[in-house]
Structure formats: C-alpha cells, structure tokens
Amino acid sequence: MAAAAAIRGVRGKLGLREIRIHLCQRSPGSQGVRDFIEKRYVELKKANPDLPILIRECSDVQPKLWARYAFGQEKNVSLNNFSADQVTRALENVLSSKA
C-alpha cells in the first residue's frame, strides 16, 4: 500500500510521532473512513509497528485525520464524505508535507 510506504519514508525526516483518525461509528460522512480502516489499517500498522496509529470513534463527530510531529506540532485534514481511496490520498498528502 502506498500510504504504508509513505509513512516509512517520511517518518524520520519529518519527525512524525503519531497519527489519529477521528470518526463516527454510523454517520454517512464517515463511511469512507470506516472502509479505509477495515481495508487498510492492518497493512498500515504492520508496516509501521512503532508508530502510534490511533482510531477514535465518537457519535456525531466529523471525520478528521490528525498527524502529530516533533515539538507538539499538529496538522489535521477533514475527511467528511471521503471514499477509502480519498482517505489514503489525504494521509499521503499530510505525510509528504511538514507540520
């Protein structure tokens, strides 16, 4: 998977410390995020066993991707109404840019 390779490639250079994904368990706007987790989380975690990848479910929350870098800097991207492939691209975009 491209996202797994992207994380391995940039983690050290950018000081990536953590990835968090916030989503709702049942809202239509979070469906693509749920699909992404179901299809790609295991591969992503296997490729990056030392990187915390946190999945946070909460009712009625807007789906969002957070990347935390060194010195507490964070970057976030809304994932509302994204497909699983769009979530993958959003993850790759966040990882390819510095906080």
UniProtKB/Swiss-Prot annotation:
Chief localisation class: mitochondrion
Chain positions found as N6-succinyllysine: 64
Residues recorded with modification N6-acetyllysine: 64, 75
SMART domains, per database record: L51_S25_CI-B8
Residue numbers bearing the N-acetylalanine modification: 2
UniProt key word Nucleotide-binding: no
Bilayer topology annotation: Peripheral membrane protein
GO cellular component: mitochondrial inner membrane; mitochondrial membrane; mitochondrion; respiratory chain complex I
Superkingdom classification of source: Eukaryota
Compartments it resides in: Mitochondrion inner membrane
Oligomer and partners: Complex I is composed of 45 different subunits.
Chain's role: Accessory subunit of the mitochondrial membrane respiratory chain NADH dehydrogenase (Complex I), that is believed not to be involved in catalysis. Complex I functions in the transfer of electrons from NADH to the respiratory chain. The immediate electron acceptor for the enzyme is believed to be ubiquinone.
Name used for this protein in its record: NADH dehydrogenase [ubiquinone] 1 alpha subcomplex subunit 2
Organism: Bos taurus
